[in-house]
Amino acid sequence: MILSDWDIRVYLEKKLLVINPLFPDTIRENGVDLRFGYQFCRFKKDQNIIVDTARDPVDKTLVCEETDENNGIIINPLEHVLATTLEWVEMPNDLIGFVNLRSTFARYSLYIPPTIIDAGFKGNITIELIGGSIPVKVYPKQRFLHVIFARTSSPVYRPYSGKYQKQRGVTPPKPD
């Protein structure tokens, strides 16, 4: 079952769901909008770098930068950029979140891969943005994600406790 704005408010008031900071326009009709944080990371453009997904951390291949509301960051066509949410999110054990790009940003030719926030997850959300056909400039604090919450049929037996638990800022991929 998808949660309405009323249900989301109840979860927040009971502190079962945490979104911090919570802005007046965060809660929408059937989900919440999350904002860009201040940190962005992009992969170096070097044909000689090959990342071994079984062994290599990608820290050496990422260039991370902080920006502000005045300067923003440009996402170039076909560029993959990791972004973080401004908000810290704590999910209860009976909700999952379906993460979607707000249609405004899709209309600017950006897109994201399908993303789920697992029951029990705590942290900032790291999201991959993919540039479309034109360069697009984005800014911290812009609402860019829409998260739809769905209640599981029962609380999950094993809440999320993986390698991205309690991540802060942009968290690059970690080998398994």
UniProtKB/Swiss-Prot annotation:
Alphabetical list of HAMAP family matching this protein: dCTP_deaminase
Keywords for the protein's UniProt record, in alphabetical order: Hydrolase, Nucleotide metabolism, Nucleotide-binding
UniProt cross-references to Pfam families, sorted A to Z: DCD
Enzyme class: hydrolase
BP GO annotations: dUMP biosynthetic process; dUTP biosynthetic process
Protein name (record): dCTP deaminase
EC number(s) from the headed UniProt entry: 3.5.4.13
Recorded family membership: Belongs to the dCTP deaminase family.
Cross-referenced PANTHER family: DCTP DEAMINASE
Reactions mediated catalytically: dCTP + H2O + H(+) = dUTP + NH4(+)
Catalytic residues (positions): E128 (proton donor/acceptor)
Natural source organism: Staphylothermus marinus (strain ATCC 43588 / DSM 3639 / JCM 9404 / F1)
